[in-house]
Amino acid sequence: MLSLAEAKEKILMALSARKLVERGWLTALLGYLAKREEVEVRLKYIGDLRLQRKDFGALAILTYYATMCQPGLPEELAKTFSRSLEPRRAFSLLLASLSLASYPCRKQSTDNKVSINMSPERLSLEVNGVSVAFNPSCVYIDSLLEIFAWGEYEVPEVLSGLRGRDVIDVGANAGDTALYFILNGARKVIAVEPLPNVARCAEENVRLSSATDKVKVINAALSYEPVGVPCDYDVRLSGSFSTLKGNGPCKVPGVTLGDLINMVDDPYLIKMDCEGCEAQVILGPEREKLRAFEHIILETHPFITGVSNEKLLASLKELGFECRPHRALDPKLGQNVYHCKSLSKEFSA
């Protein structure tokens, strides 16, 4: 049950989306607050849609943040995407674009110099002279939301020391996390993604971002041996694929943590969102190599691995890391994001 304060906040954010909803806004809002699974709306320019509750909530929140610095942007984007796309695809790109656009607005920094350019062919964002761009056919919408809108990797202590440092990104998907780290000053990112077509999307997005000198995409699995994966997995669903649960006819090489560390000069951060492989790294024979990093950001998946979060955190504590919860993604499943800081690195500095 929502508290009064939470309900007021959600209503305030939903008011921002009202300018996009031609019909059904109040009914959708009441359904959203009552936690109905689906709501029906007619969006300006786009048309009639049946939205999942989370999508209506995302539209409300993203519109709220985007209008802080560009009041007319949501309507402009809806109009642009409706010209050549069917309603569902237009809505998906609207959410993706608002995710990118809301990022600098949400940070509310007057020092940010921001340029936004969204079209059905290219989604691009430039902040303080650093740009990232995505092919709309090569994006996982939920991932963009998590990274740029919800701040899944927005750990101030990590970002404040990221400039000019190196990152290993395990579970890179379509390159969105790697490009997020570049946007925040990383010098080099090694991006590991096991699904071949998703890795190609990551390469495409890195190319569009003119970041091929900073991001190296590796189509491989974190493993001691080659792994079989699907050859053509739907990018829009790829965020939930796990090499521990799925397989396929395409063989991709295995890379070890040691291999990845040897690819960078300054292992500052390792990010792991690999649907279960984090347990293999933290409890496996190369676990001591994690000491090379100053920071770890990991997403846990006990429902896949059968390994409790407590066991993983205890292992990291033995390695000299202090771990704190950053985001609770699904409390029922124990799916959380943790930030772990090396205490030995802190004291040696």
Question: Language-model features: where?
Answer:
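Phosphate/nucleotide-binding beta-alpha loop and adjacent structural elements of enzyme active sites
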Residues: 1-349
